[in-house]
């Protein structure tokens, strides 16, 4: 690992070992070969149920993690791994956090995906259109240097997630 600023390296609190998001780019590639992908999302284990709150920066992921602290295990508030297993889909915490430094390497069975939208009122809206769900998931996907092979595996996985995992829009204030 190379860094020309020793003071920054020794201070710690880096979101990546290389001070550039190369680790997530490398992991995103490897996950495709292991029936997995990496999403811009907050994941929690709520009473043994994995909930995935999906959103871009400033979308409310860290806010929800803060609200759920003490009520659910925070896996990570910014980057979550999803993998297909023999038991179904699981979410895994990562070290690549946002504003909430609570992270866990634990996993939980994925029970629902909630796409975050800021609103003046709180609503939970079920999503039924699988193509819409697929498009939404693709827009939050952490991508490596893409190849045809990676896209084939990842698209297949995203379509499978869209078909099997309940998805919602969570509007909240």
Sequence positions of predicted segments:
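Short, well-ordered alpha-helical scaffold segments within catalytic/effector domains
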Residues: 23-24, 37, 155
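Short hydrophobic/aromatic-rich motifs at helix boundaries and adjacent loops
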Residues: 12-14, 36, 126-130
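Charged, amphipathic alpha-helical linker segments immediately N-terminal to NTP-binding catalytic cores
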Residues: 1-28
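Conserved NTPase motor "head" modules and their coupling/switch loops across ABC/AAA+ ATPases, GTPases
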Residues: 28-43
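Conserved glycine(s) of the Walker
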Residues: 59-61
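Glycine-rich, often acidic-flanked micro-motifs
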Residues: 40-56, 66-173
